[in-house]
Amino acid sequence: MDRIVIQGGARLEGRIEISGAKNSALKLMAAALLTDEPVILTRMPRLADSRFLGHLLEKLGVEVSDGQDAQLRLHAATIADTFAPYDLVRKMRASFNVLGPLLAREGHARVSLPGGCAIGARPVDLHLKALKALGAQIEISEGYVSAKAPAGGLVGGEIDLPFASVGATEHAMLAASLARGETVIENAAREPEIGDLADCLTAMGATIEGAGSSTIRIQGQSRLSGVTHKVVADRIETATYALAVAAAGGDAVLEGAVLAHNKALWSSMGEAGVTVEAVADGVRVARNGSRLDSVDIETQPFPGFPTDAQAQFMALMSLANGSSVIRETIFENRFMHAPELARLGADITVHGNEAVVRGVERLRGAPVMATDLRASVSLVIAGLAAEGETVVNRVYHLDRGFERLEAKLTGCGARIERLPDGA
């Protein structure tokens, strides 16, 4: 199993190209099931998660081929199978999003309940509620969801989500695009990835209004066409590299990043003493040598502070002047990185969904272990800022969400390398 070795203390200077958003790309891949024409995705991130989903789509009959310049071509000319087995779905919960498209196109599907990061209870109840609102009959047995559409296919309906679930909103949008009539999603998620999916589905022929607001209206079509679509820039990757620059010190441009997609984060970083500004081709982040100020944050659905940047921000606050309070309101059990940051010298106390971070003057390198995707990259950030050598073990988590992480950081001056076991 690979590990990442970091020699801390180097400033980050230069440019980092931001990849397409993983959380958007996976739903766009699932959208290829809605049409018998080719779907071509550009700025497609090359990640373990996208490979996992690609294998599942191939099993369902989709032709999947990589092109040059971060391009992925998917062609579901026919659906060979509507069964998504456990061994393919368990690796990543986003695989569950094939259920709606299969149901909408073929009228039936059987999909395993999902796996993925072990972050609290992340049920699919809202996904199933949305599909039921479109007329689907749902049965759950022995770890599988069996779904059947009414005669004539799914029918538009009213979907009122109890909270703004990103996954349920996206799943409903996918299925509703091939449903008869209008679907209205109330209390819809507002993340930029929702808008990206809406843009793609609209280009395929669906009529969608209100993406980015709490009410989305979808006029389904009997048939959707192929499309070439550029995946939106990854706002979490943007946040991660911005926080890395802030922690290690330096001045870098994040190419392709969209300033408007991380306003809450930029506000907190600015309050801490980090410079963040829009430039012609992205976002510039800079920090001088002075110690940062502590800042309290609370994770919230977009446009609030993103839960997927909480661990990375905690790494930054571990070096700030004073104490900060970090409240996690989205997922339970999402402070698993705190004990590992403590191995590097961080002073963190966790009480339920709240962590108190007492800033220290310096962190010191040590062996640490990644527990999930965002936790693993928070340890990389801390290692970049620490004195001496940090070794991050179990880095397969990183490969699920970050493309060429070591190369991107090395290009800005970081001393970081990946080593296989035994090396």
Curated annotation (Swiss-Prot):
Single GO BP term: cell wall organization
The family assignment reads: Belongs to the EPSP synthase family. MurA subfamily.
The answer to keyword Transmembrane helix applying to this record is no
Task: Provide the function of this protein.
Answer: Cell wall formation. Adds enolpyruvyl to UDP-N-acetylglucosamine.
Q: Which GO MF terms does the UniProt record name?
A: UDP-N-acetylglucosamine 1-carboxyvinyltransferase activity
Q: Which InterPro entries match?
A: Enolpyruvate_Tfrase_dom (IPR001986), Enolpyruvate_Tfrase_sf (IPR036968), MurA_subfamily (IPR050068), RNA3'P_cycl/enolpyr_Trfase_a/b (IPR013792), UDP_GlcNAc_COvinyl_MurA (IPR005750)
Q: Where does the protein principally reside? A: cytoplasm
The record's listing under NCBIfam families reads: murA, PRK09369.1
Task: Provide the protein's localization.
Answer: Cytoplasm
State the protein's name.
UDP-N-acetylglucosamine 1-carboxyvinyltransferase
Cite a GO CC annotation. cytoplasm
In-chain residues carrying the UniProt-annotated modification 2-(S-cysteinyl)pyruvic acid O-phosphothioketal: C117
Q: Which domain of life is it from?
A: Bacteria
Enzyme active site: C117
Pfam families linked to this entry: EPSP_synthase
Species per Swiss-Prot/TrEMBL record? Maricaulis maris (strain MCS10) (Caulobacter maris)
Q: Where does phosphoenolpyruvate bind?
A: K22, N23
Enumerate the UniProt keywords alphabetically.
Cell cycle, Cell division, Cell shape, Cell wall biogenesis/degradation, Cytoplasm, Peptidoglycan synthesis, Pyruvate, Transferase
Q: What is its EC number?
A: 2.5.1.7
Q: Which positions in this protein are listed as binding UDP-N-acetyl-alpha-D-glucosamine?
A: R93, R122, P123, V124, D125, L126, D308, I330
Q: Taxonomic lineage per UniProt? A: Bacteria, Pseudomonadati, Pseudomonadota, Alphaproteobacteria, Maricaulales
Pathway linked to the protein: Cell wall biogenesis; peptidoglycan biosynthesis
Q: List the catalysed reactions.
A: phosphoenolpyruvate + UDP-N-acetyl-alpha-D-glucosamine = UDP-N-acetyl-3-O-(1-carboxyvinyl)-alpha-D-glucosamine + phosphate
